[in-house]
Amino acid sequence: MRGSFMKIYIVLGLLISLAIIFLMIYYIPSTDDLSPDNPFFNGLSTFVSRYNVSRISISDLDKIGVGTIVFLIGPDKNFDQYDAARVRDYLSRGGIFFIADDYGTSQELIDLLRINISLYRGVLRDPLLMYKNSYLPRVDVYIGRETLHLYMNYGTAIDISKTYEGSCIGYSSVLSFLEIYEGSNRTGRKVGGAVMYII
């Protein structure tokens, strides 16, 4: 009799433990970088809730209406001609397509769209104006009369030296630099002029 009660207690203990684990998984938010469910500094939950943002795939761009803004945030996939055609069609209908890239992953899409800029394959660092460490530099973005202080999460920079179009809206401090990845070596060499063009 006593052994059967022990089995019941063990089973109940396991069931309660599993219930607690599942509740913790359900209620603890995601901490993934750039996740729409992440409420921390490296997440997008405030952005998603404040601006009523919804997730879509590139194949759904033809369903998006005029007067919308699409953000491509932290891309991590290879792009092909199909993706570029969807983006090109969206842009031709008057859409705004904003690329927020880390490590220059979207260079392939930019090339397929025949835009004459290149993303540096490196990380913007700033030892002066930053959040917690130099890989999270502050960038001041000027839109109209408003200044936004953005903290880039392993951001990169744009090289527009081959084109005469475009303008810079975001600036890091004068002590910022690019850590360029060249094979397995990292270099802290200066690239380009004094202005950092930030995505």
Each predicted region: which residue ranges?
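Short, surface-exposed patches at the edges or C-terminal ends of soluble domains, predominantly
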Residues: 1-199
